[in-house]
Amino acid sequence: MKGLFKSKPRTPADLVRQTRDLLLFSDRSTSLPDLRDSKRDEKMAELSRNIRDMKSILYGNSEAEPVAEACAQLTQEFFKEDTLRLLITCLPKLNLETRKDATQVVANLQRQQVNSRLIASDYLEANIDLMDVLIEGFENTDMALHYGAMFRECIRHQIVAKYVLESDHVKKFFDYIQLPNFDIAADAAATFKELLTRHKSTVAEFLTKNEDWFFADYNSKLLESSNYITRRQAIKLLGDILLDRSNSAVMTKYVSSRDNLRILMNLLRESSKSIQIEAFHVFKLFAANQNKPADIVNILVANRSKLLRLLADLKPDKEDERFEADKSQVLREIAALEPRDLA
C-alpha cells in the first residue's frame, strides 16, 4: 500500500514553477516586516536547493549526464514567464554559492534549444531592458562578476549585442575596464572584447557609424591609459578588430589618421615587449597602406631612422617566421618612402 501514497517526482517544469514562486517570495519578503526570520531562512534555503537542482539538470552531475528532454522542459518553462527577470532582481539576496549556481544556470540557458530555436534570444528581445540591469551591475562590487558573466552569455545573441552597441551602454565599458578592482576590470575587458568581435556584421555596422567618437575614446581612454594592463589589452583588441576582414573599410580610415599613427608610434617605443609586438601588428597596417595620405608619409619619413632602428631590434620571445616576414616588408616599405607635398 505504501507505493500508492508516494509523491510524484518533480518534473523540470515543476521545479521551475516552484523556483519562480520562491523568487516571488524573496522579492516581496523585504516588505513583510512581520515575517519570522526562521520562515524567511527556510524559504531561502529551499530556493538555494532548487537553483542547485536546476544546475544539475542542465549540466549533469557526477552520476549522470544532462538529459536533452529534461533540459528542454526546464528551458521552456523558465522563459515562459518572467523567471529570468526575477532571478536577476533577486540575485543580491542570495548567498554567494547560490549566486554562482544561478549565474551558471542563466549562462547554460542561453545555449539551450527548444524545437531547434534558441528561445532565450526571443525572450531577451522582448525583455531587452534586462540588459540595462546587467550592465549597471558592473558598478556593484559584490554583484559585478555574476552580472558580468550573465551579460557576456546574453550577448551571444546577435539581437542583444546589437541593442548594447546601439545604446549608450557601450561607452560605459571604457570606464569599467579601468575600475580599481582588478577582477571586475578584467571581466569588463573580456566582455568588451566579446562585444566587439563575436558578431562580425553587427560590429562592422557599429564601427562604420560610430568610428569617430569610438576611436577617439579608444585612443585617449585605453591606448593612452596610465595603466599598463589596460594599454596591453587595448592594443591587442585593436589589432583583432582592424585585422578582421569584416572591418576593412574601418581599418582603411583608421590608418589614414595622423593622430592614430602618433599613438601607435608611441606604443612601439614602450618598455614592454608584449605591447611593442601588439603595436607592431597595427603599425604594419599603416606601412602597408598603398594609398597613404601625404601627412602620414611625411611623418614616417621624418621618423624613418628611428623607426628602422627600433623595428630592427624588435623580436618576439619565440621564433616567429611570419612576424619576421611582416617586419622585413615593413622595413622595405618605410625605407622606400619619399617625402610628399601636402595638398
Swiss-Prot record:
GO terms for cellular component: plastid. InterPro entries: ARM-like, ARM-type_fold, Mo25. Belongs to the Mo25 family. This is Putative MO25-like protein At5g47540. It comes from Arabidopsis thaliana. The lineage of its organism: Eukaryota, Viridiplantae, Streptophyta, Embryophyta, Tracheophyta.
